[in-house]
Amino acid sequence: MRLIAGLCLTLAATLPAAAQTVLSEASGNWAGTSGEGFTFLARLTHNEDMARLTIWGGGPGSSAVAEGAPQFDNAEIALGAFATLQELTVVDGSDGSVLQIVTEYADEEGTGRIVTDLQFIDNQFTVVGYFHAGEHLGQGFECDVDLWNMIATENGQQRQLDPVGFDALNASDWTWDAAYERGFCTRS
């Protein structure tokens, strides 16, 4: 009997874990249009009511692949519940690439679109921008946050945000409502 139990445990340990549904993948080069930096492969997967972002890195001149331990893994970076669209996009610029997490959602109370911008800066996955617009209970709203310049524009009104340390913009603990929790956007 112990032999069977041991065999079952061994078999269970060697089987792969249940795969999460892949929602979107994107790849690029953190150096942007020059293509002379580190490459990356980003994957957005379904994780219960949230979306998980996982990023693997590659060296200059070699493609990143989804093997081994990822450089970045945040299991709750974006909203998953009520999502009608979830995708990753890469915006290449002369100053580097921005990885965008795009979520569109709809429920009985409203609709909206959230875009979170990430860059790899000084060995940190950094949130550099956040945009949330939509309608809630018949009332429209919009919040656009430029974390490079610490400026938030809410419903057409611009305000200067208090400076924060570099670590405060680390994407590893960013969640779908972090911009509200940290005071970058306000709830009306």
Regions found by a protein language model. Give the residues of each.
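Acidic, small-residue rich beta-repeat scaffolds with periodic aromatic anchors
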Residues: G96-S188
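Bacterial N-terminal signal peptides
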Residues: A5-T14
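Beta-propeller blade repeat segments, especially FG-GAP/WD-type strand-to-loop junctions
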Residues: A51-A69, D117-D122
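A low-complexity, Ser/Thr/Gly/Pro-enriched, surface-exposed linker/loop concept
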Residues: A66-A81
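Sec/Tat signal peptide C-region and signal peptidase I cleavage site
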Residues: L15-A19
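Beta-propeller blade termini
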Residues: T21-T33, G80-G96
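Short, surface-exposed coil-to-beta transition loops
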Residues: F38, M50-R52, G110-V115
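Acidic/hydrophobic-patterned starts of short beta strands in beta-sheet-rich repeat architectures
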Residues: A31-T45, T54, D92-Y105
